Structure formats: structure tokens, C-alpha cells
Amino acid sequence: MEMNLQFFSHHKGGGSTSNGRDSAGRRLGTKRADGQAAKAGMIIYRQRGTHIYPGVNVGRGNDDTLFALADGVVRFERKGRDKRQVSVYPVADAE
């Protein structure tokens, strides 16, 4: 009489998962707040797409970053009913 014994693992296999990764945050968002002074060239808002549109004295980079074109004070405003824009208004020199 011949016996055929098979021993099975008492621990399940390790398996695999498709999780376990994450990327660093992209540091998007407001860099200059409403009412803050900004010099020409300063970044005001970093974004992907146009959450906020450029207004007076504000330019838009090819990565949609908004930056000041002139020295002044930053103002976040409404553009129509459902859009927002940011402008930089020059301040008169007090002498």
C-alpha cells in the first residue's frame, strides 16, 4: 500500500498589491493674498488650468501661473457670475 502525502503551506502567500505609492504635493495655490503688496514678476497664484483668470497688471505663464506685471496691491475679484480673477492695482506714492 503506497501513501501519497502532500503538505500544504500553513501561511498564505505574500501576494501583491497595486497600492503603496504616493507623489509629493505640487505646492499649488495662493502665494500672495488679497491686499498684499506685490512687485513685478512676483508669483501670485500657482494653478493647473485656469481656476482664477488674470486681470489688470497680471500675466499668465505657460503652466497657468499668475504673476504680477507691475508693482502694486493684489486684489481677488469676481469676473461675471461664476469666474474669479486677480488684479494688481498700483498704489500712489505718498510723499
Swiss-Prot record:
GO molecular function: structural constituent of ribosome
InterPro entries in alphabetical order: Ribosomal_bL27 (IPR001684), Ribosomal_bL27_CS (IPR018261)
Sequence intervals crossing the membrane: none
Post-translational modification: The N-terminus is cleaved by ribosomal processing cysteine protease Prp.
Segments forming a coiled coil: none
One GO BP: translation
Chain positions listed as propeptide in the UniProt record: 1-8
UniProt keyword terms in alphabetical order: Ribonucleoprotein, Ribosomal protein
Gene Ontology cellular-component annotations: cytosolic large ribosomal subunit
Record bears the keyword Iron: no
PROSITE patterns documented for this protein: RIBOSOMAL_L27
Region (Disordered): 1-34
Stored PANTHER family: LARGE RIBOSOMAL SUBUNIT PROTEIN BL27M, RIBOSOMAL PROTEIN L27
Family the entry assigns: Belongs to the bacterial ribosomal protein bL27 family.
Protein name: Large ribosomal subunit protein bL27
Lineage, opening ranks: Bacteria, Bacillati, Bacillota, Bacilli, Lactobacillales
